[in-house]
From Swiss-Prot:
<dbReference type="GO" id="GO:0006122">
    <property type="term" value="P:mitochondrial electron transport, ubiquinol to cytochrome c"/>
</dbReference>
<dbReference type="GO" id="GO:0045275">
    <property type="term" value="C:respiratory chain complex III"/>
</dbReference>
<feature type="binding site" description="axial binding residue">
    <location>
        <position position="182"/>
    </location>
    <ligand>
        <name>heme b b562</name>
    </ligand>
</feature>
<feature type="binding site">
    <location>
        <position position="201"/>
    </location>
    <ligand>
        <name>a ubiquinone</name>
    </ligand>
</feature>
<feature type="transmembrane region" description="Helical">
    <location>
        <begin position="226"/>
        <end position="246"/>
    </location>
</feature>
<dbReference type="InterPro" id="IPR048260">
    <property type="entry name" value="Cytochrome_b_C_euk/bac"/>
</dbReference>
<keyword id="KW-0830">Ubiquinone</keyword>
<keyword id="KW-0679">Respiratory chain</keyword>
<keyword id="KW-0813">Transport</keyword>
<keyword id="KW-0812">Transmembrane</keyword>
<dbReference type="GO" id="GO:0005743">
    <property type="term" value="C:mitochondrial inner membrane"/>
</dbReference>
<dbReference type="GO" id="GO:0008121">
    <property type="term" value="F:ubiquinol-cytochrome-c reductase activity"/>
</dbReference>
<feature type="binding site" description="axial binding residue">
    <location>
        <position position="83"/>
    </location>
    <ligand>
        <name>heme b b562</name>
    </ligand>
</feature>
<keyword id="KW-0999">Mitochondrion inner membrane</keyword>
<comment type="function">
    <text>Component of the ubiquinol-cytochrome c reductase complex (complex III or cytochrome b-c1 complex) that is part of the mitochondrial respiratory chain. The b-c1 complex mediates electron transfer from ubiquinol to cytochrome c. Contributes to the generation of a proton gradient across the mitochondrial membrane that is then used for ATP synthesis.</text>
</comment>
<feature type="binding site" description="axial binding residue">
    <location>
        <position position="196"/>
    </location>
    <ligand>
        <name>heme b b566</name>
    </ligand>
</feature>
<feature type="transmembrane region" description="Helical">
    <location>
        <begin position="33"/>
        <end position="53"/>
    </location>
</feature>
Length: 379
């Protein structure tokens, strides 16, 4: 008798993706973040669904409906904080996943990598629109400032902004459409994640050595499922520590004040996971230039496969490139810190130097390091 998981049309798909999938024997814990991102997405969709049952997307009642969820709904406070901190967790896993991809040269799987970049843009859009929904001060002013950046686009900019707003300012129409998009986009993210997996399974996973591993493959289950399960337990432990003990650690106190179009907060800033890009935006005095730099700070990932000069895929045995990689990580952390600071000296010049370094490391220094390393290895 044949095994059902190998013959049943639905089970066969699951089998090929999660059970009998040939996996490199030497993949490390850095390969856990794909499954953890899947878990984060499930947590966000589930908690978001329950929040949507009690939320009203109206400028007069949005803030009080969130208060009602926290005070009157059974475990509403838990669902709300799980959703808010789940977004932070999502981005922590996302950035670690991308960092792993850069370090081990996973960007050579072009389709998988490009779909990953689309997933990153979709997730950022979803998170931004979700931040607007509680209709606190930072929600309102964040939405106003970030959507207003589109007015820098020549000729169509102003019309585009008013079209997105649904009027001449951020108002009821804006909140309503953001609620609709914020609800619908995660399902598109889930669909794109499936395509991401589809392309990954066409080539098979990369591994820390960055060399073909067809001669040394093991089945995904039970080895990598057990490993993923450990990652999930550790992630949930960290997540619930954050949710139950420090729920407001990553939030902005200004968002506990209802939105007031007549009162601008002293420091308008997005959530922590956008601060590095916000710092790059602010470091360029020209509005259009800033917007281009903002988009390029993410889109630059798409250039990685085309600008690499090294003949080794992974950075594991390339000390100069390793140094540059960790310099890049430090630079992103500095940008994140600067993005949360007010625009005044010395924060301005630090932001400009860090922004310049961000692009210089990726576009200039890493390709040069690759050439030097090739020469050192006499390749």
């Amino acid at each position: 008798m044949t095994i059902m998981r190998k013959t049943h049309p639905l089970m066969k798909m699951v089998n090929h993706a999660f059970i009998d999938l040939p996996t490199p024997a030497n993949i490390s814990g850095w390969w856990n973040f794909g499954s953890l991102l899947g878990l984060c997405l499930i947590i966000q969709i589930a908690s978001g669904l329950f929040l949507a049952m009690h939320y009203t997307p109206d400028t007069l009642t949005a803030f009080s409906s969130v208060t009602h969820i926290c005070r009157d709904v059974n475990y509403g406070w838990l669902i709300r904080y799980m959703h808010a901190n789940g977004a932070s967790l999502f981005f922590i896993c996302l950035y670690l996943h991308i960092g792993r991809g850069i370090y081990y040269g996973s960007y050579y799987y072009m389709e998988t990598w490009n779909i990953g970049i689309i997933l990153l843009f979709l997730t950022m859009a979803t998170a931004f629109m979700g931040y607007v929904l509680p209709w606190g001060q930072m929600s309102f002013w964040g939405a106003t400032v970030i959507t207003n950046l589109l007015s820098a686009i020549p000729y169509i900019g102003t019309d585009l902004v008013e079209w997105i707003w649904g009027g001449f300012s951020v108002d009821k129409a804006t909140l309503n459409r953001f609620x609709a998009f914020h609800f619908x986009l995660p399902f598109x993210i889930a669909a794109m994640a499936m395509v991401h997996l589809l392309f990954l399974h066409e080539t098979g996973s990369n591994n820390p050595l960055g060399i073909p591993s067809d001669c040394d493959k093991i089945p995904f289950h039970p080895y990598x499922t057990t490993k993923d399960f450990l990652g999930i337990v550790l992630l949930l432990a960290f997540f619930f520590t954050l949710v139950l003990f420090f729920p407001d650690l990553l939030g902005d106190p200004d968002n506990y004040s209802p939105a007031n179009p007549l009162n601008t907060p002293p420091h308008i800033k997005p959530e922590w996971y956008f601060l590095f890009a916000y710092a790059i935006l602010r470091s360029i005095p020209n509005k259009l230039g800033g917007v281009i730099a903002l988009v390029m700070s993410i889109l630059i990932l798409a250039l990685l496969p085309h600008i690499q000069t090294a003949k080794q895929r992974s950075l594991m045995f390339r000390p100069i490139s390793q140094l540059l990689f960790w310099l890049l990580v430090s630079d992103v952390l500095i940008l994140t810190w600067i993005g949360g600071q007010p625009v005044e000296p010395p924060x301005i010049i630090i932001g400009q130097i860090a922004s310049f370094l961000y692009f210089a490391i990726i576009l200039v220094l890493m390709p040069i390091a690759g050439i030097i390393e090739n020469k050192m290895l006499k390749w």
